[in-house]
From Swiss-Prot:
Enzyme class: lyase
EC number: 4.2.3.21
Induction: By elicitor from R.solani.
Highest taxon of source: Eukaryota
Binding site for Mg(2+) 1: D308, D312
GO MF annotations, alphabetized: magnesium ion binding; vetispiradiene synthase activity
Annotated protein name in UniProt: Vetispiradiene synthase 1
Source taxonomy: Eukaryota, Viridiplantae, Streptophyta, Embryophyta, Tracheophyta
Reactions catalysed, as given in the entry: (2E,6E)-farnesyl diphosphate = (-)-vetispiradiene + diphosphate
Annotated localization: Cytoplasm
Keywords from the UniProt entry: Cytoplasm, Lyase, Magnesium, Metal-binding
Keyword Cytoplasm: yes
CDD domains documented for this protein: Terpene_cyclase_plant_C1
Organism: Hyoscyamus muticus (Egyptian henbane)
């Protein structure tokens, strides 16, 4: 980021602005127009209904099969992305499995693969099952038996199961180390598709992956399986393509809205990432019933990105102080106090939330927009504090930094906004979220520390000293490497908190909690290998976006 001297009409003086050199959008006008082929969509929908009935019958029949067969069927249906059609049936099956043998005494649990799949599925569905099920695979010294190293499928699912661990579950920590070591050794010698699955899993665990991304990958892998279920595979392909049509339609709406705002021309200092913003929303919820929610959340992410860059990459303290105050007052009459460039984003922000209120009033839910506004005011107030630190060269203590930075992670705002378009989200859910429950704080912490690790070098190059890493280094007199290790440790702890908070009993439904879990998953994918995939989407996000909203699956 190179400083630039510009003349401001707001105040007759030369102002040095740290103008950012963000790369342009990768997508141009690619997504601005899309029309659904209704004939194809109708054809897909009709066949899906038939396949849906057949799959439901298959699930019912599975109740009379072995435990291993039940679990494998549920796992395949979930990984193919069609489980949302059968939520009640799957929940009933898992509940029966859990209640029928709560101590896992069935002989089938002596199989590592069966035990691992069962443990992960039950944990992911909120059952607080004990990891002691894996003690039967350890020797007298409490070490995993070396004889297991030939069971690659079992090791792969043990690895996946280890990622749902919570605090003080040492056996799962050991399971992770044990499985990774043997899978890495075995990977070069395996045949496809198992070799591909192992390599992919070691790069991105299932539990921490974005569901829609993982579904697209698994469909291609499952097609290579020798003993695949052709009915389920065809169902998954049709459903993926039909849902993709809806996603393309929504992205077209968001892209046109973004183009009409013309921020690329009027606010050239800011990131042009509308497509990446929509990608995030597919990570939060991909199912068709969340269409309105996705569009609302995508627009909010795009808007907060503009506000963030205004504070971080362009504004000066005097301007930012007035901008912050105007947003706290949330009144269009405040616009005349602002410099010209700030008037643009201020009006767009207020207009957006007015649109939300009008849209939600149709369902009698306009009152919940208040909670999203309050989160917007909160994050802007915290942005101002960070902006002052940067401009004035102030370095806070790490505790002072984190107390402010959890809000600027954006996850308080985005989680609240993610509920706006969900008809099932009640005022009580927003009230619960406003208390900053443990799972929300964990998510914000995860987002903050992972972002800080990924952006440290860039921010250091801009002269930013009030970063989390720098604050920790100064407070504790340690090296950059040690500080980053500490922040990674904080991320690991946050993940355990998230995993723990989705286990029953829970204060809200799994539908509500899953949005928070999915936001955590987005961080794991977007900042893979300490890269800021949002600011620099070329390597990290571009392939996923192409897979999700450009390329359909060959039927």
């Amino acid at each position: 980021m190179a400083p630039a001297i510009v003349m401001s009409n707001y105040e007759e003086e030369e102002i040095v602005r740290p103008v950012a050199d963000f790369s342009p959008s990768l997508w141009g006008d690619h997504f601005h127009s899309f029309s659904v082929d209704n004939q194809v969509a109708e054809k897909y929908a009709q066949e899906i209904e038939t396949l849906k009935e057949q799959t439901s019958t298959m699930l019912s029949a599975a109740c009379g099969t072995t435990l291993t067969e039940k679990l494998n069927l549920i796992d395949i249906i979930e990984r193919l992305g069609i489980a949302y059609h059968f939520e009640k049936q799957i929940e009933d099956m898992l509940d029966h499995i859990y209640r029928a043998d709560p101590y896992f005494e069935a002989h089938e649990y002596n199989d590592l693969n069966t035990s691992s799949v069962q443990f992960r599925l039950l944990r992911q569905h909120g059952y607080n099952v004990s990891p002691n099920i894996f003690s039967r695979f350890q020797d007298a010294n409490g070490k995993f038996k070396e004889s297991l190293r030939s069971d690659i499928r079992g090791l792969l699912n043990l690895y996946e199961a280890s990622h749902v661990r919570t605090h003080k579950e040492d056996i799962l920590e050991e399971a992770l180390v044990f499985s990774v070591g043997h899978l890495e050794s075995a990977a070069p010698h395996l045949k496809s598709p198992l070799s591909k699955q192992v390599t992919h899993a070691l790069e991105q665990s299932l539990h921490k992956s974005i569901p829609r991304v993982e579904i697209r990958y698994f469909i291609s892998i499952y097609e290579e399986e020798e003993f695949k279920n052709d009915l389920l595979l065809r169902f998954a392909k049709l459903d993926y393509n039909l849902l993709q049509m809806l996603h393309k339609h929504e992205l077209s709406e968001v892209s046109r809205w973004w183009k009409d705002l013309d921020f690329v021309t009027t606010l050239p200092y800011a990131r042009d990432r509308a497509v990446e913003c929509y990608f995030w929303t597919m990570g939060v919820y991909a199912e068709p019933q969340y269409s309105q929610a996705r569009v609302m959340l995508a627009k909010t992410i795009a808007m907060i990105s503009i506000v963030d860059d205004t504070f971080d990459a362009y504004g000066i303290v005097k301007e930012l102080e007035v901008y912050t105050d105007a947003i706290q007052r949330w009144d269009i009459s405040q616009i005349d106090r602002l410099p010209e460039y700030m008037k643009i984003s201020y009006k767009a922000l207020l207009d957006l939330y007015d649109d939300y209120e009008k849209e939600l009033s149709k369902d009698g839910r306009s009152d919940v927009v208040h909670y999203a506004k309050e989160r917007m005011k909160e994050i802007v107030g915290n942005y101002f504090i960070e902006g002052k630190w940067f401009i004035e060269g102030y370095m806070p203590s790490v505790s002072e930094y984190l107390s402010n930075a959890l809000a600027t992670s954006t996850y308080y705002l985005l989680t609240t906004t993610s509920y706006l378009g969900m008809k099932s989200a009640t005022k009580e859910h927003f009230e619960w979220l406003a208390t900053n429950p443990k799972i929300l704080e964990a998510n914000a912490t995860l987002c903050r520390v992972v972002d800080d690790i990924a952006t440290y070098e860039v921010e250091k190059g801009r002269g930013q000293i009030a970063t989390g890493i720098e604050c920790y280094m100064r407070d504790y007199g340690v090296s950059t490497e040690v500080a980053m290790e500490k922040f990674q440790e904080m991320a690991d702890i946050a993940w355990k908190d998230v995993n723990e908070e989705i286990l029953r009993p829970t204060p809200v439904s799994s539908e509500i909690l899953t949005r928070i879990l999915n936001l955590a998953r987005i961080i794991d994918v977007t900042y893979k290998h300490n890269q800021d995939g949002y600011t620099h989407p070329e390597k990290v996000l571009k392939p996923h976006i192409i897979a999700l909203v450009v390329d359909s699956i060959d039927i």
